Structure formats: C-alpha cells, structure tokens
Amino acid sequence: PMMSLRFAATRSMAARSFSSTTVASSLDRMQTVETYNAVLEKFAQIRACAVLRTATSEACPKAMGAAIDGGFKIVEFTLTTPDCLTHVADFRAKYDGDVMVGCGTILTIADAEAAVDAGSEFIITPVMLPDVIQWCAERNIVSVPGCQTPTELVNAYRHGAPLQKLFPGVTGGPGWVKAVSSALPFLSINPTSGVDLDNAGDFLRMGAASVGLVAPLFDPEAIANEDFDQVAKNAAKVMANVREVGPYVRKA
C-alpha cells in the first residue's frame, strides 16, 4: 500500500517520548497536530526548500525574495546569517499562508525556542541532536535534523523527527539515497548540500522526500554582485525540475 508523508508523521508522532497528553498540552510553545501535519503536507507537495546564509543582513531579504519570486514556497534562514530571526519574523508576516518559513543551523533548545518565537514553522539542525528533536516532537514542531549515516537517520526518526536531513548530500548522491530509502522505506530523507540546479529531480526520483538548495541556488557571485535576477532564474529552473517529479508519496 502507498503511504503519504502525513501518515508517516502519525507513525513518527506515536514514537515520541511523552505519554501524557495533559503534560504535553501544558508545554510552552505547543503547536497543534493540525499545524504539524500542515507543515509536513507542504513539504510533501513542494519538495524543495531554499536554504540561505549570507554574509550581510542587507543581502538576505533580497536574495530570499528572489528565490520566492522564482517559485520557492519553503524557505530556511540560517542562524549564521546576521539578523536571522528578524528576517524570519519579517518573511513570516509578509508571506504567511503562502510561503512556509523555517530556521536552520539550530544547535540548542534555546536556539529552537528563539526561532519559534520569531515565527519559524519548522526547525533544522546541521547534526543529529536528540534533545532538540525531542523538544520539538513534544510540542508538535517539525524538526529536520542533519544526519550522515543510515544509523543516524534511523535514530533521528526514532527520536521523533518526521524528516531527516542528509547533510552533506554530496557524500553519496542520488544513488546513496536510493539504496538507503529502499532498505529503510519509513525514512523521509532530505538531502541538502550537493543538490544543484540539475540534479534536484534525480534525488527525488531516487527516493528523497524533499531537497534543500544552498549555494547553487544562491550563487555567491550573483549575490555579491546583487544580481538577484539570476537567483530568481536559478530558482525557477530548480522548481521546474522538481515539479516534473510530482508530490511525495512512498511505499510503506
């Protein structure tokens, strides 16, 4: 039978560490199950996230705005970008209901709290951090932890992460994703770094649930030259590639 990402979320939620709904409902920053599922549904439909880190605060909204103009509907601001949380809040206010906004390079629960307070709709970490995953899972917040091995991917899933970020994705490429997703079909793998303007669709066809686009989308030279039209063109190329594959549905 076929299993959608929404059903996978239900399975992941069932594996969470908390058992008392009374305790869970009293937690700070608690989100609804409907919100949690809506985030996962957006990932399943759109399947590509624009991941931005810039050296200056000024370049950040221009670059991300260009990616959105090119068709991206899921975006991630990294904490390494100056004024990251301000940009999260601004874009959430400007695009709420159309573009889903998240925060990356989260390393601590305090980072996650600040990101959620700014309006982040999902949390992404560069490495597998069980405490952050569990904090998010207890609050119906989607986390996408960075993993490098099949063992880390499975452990992230067991801790409550409904999506697992393969970072860096360049290490194994689409063939690696195919092998791992075939052996472990309950995983929802999100390769990031190593995904470019041409191979995004290949990763998805080989079993990735979604992909993250970093430097190939946000070309450093284009940003340095303030050529944001080029960023928009890059975005349009990627999204056309991704749309050819269609929404995410996988076998149980």
Language-model segment annotations:
Residues 150-162, 174-183:
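Anionic-ligand binding region
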Residues 51-53, 74-81, 98-107, 120-129, ...:
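Catalytic beta/alpha-barrel core
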Residues 108-118, 151-159, 195-210:
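Catalytic cores of alpha/beta
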Residues 1-30:
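N-terminal mitochondrial targeting presequence
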Residues 15, 26-112, 116-118, 138, ...:
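Conserved N-terminal beta1-alpha1 strand-loop-helix module at the mouth
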Residues 59, 87, 110-111, 131-132, ...:
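Short acidic active-site motifs
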Residues 126-132, 166-174, 208-228:
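Glycine-rich phosphate-binding active-site loops on the catalytic face of alpha/beta enzymes
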Residues 68-73, 95-98, 116-123, 138-144, ...:
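Glycine-enriched alpha-helix->loop->beta-strand junction motifs that scaffold or abut catalytic
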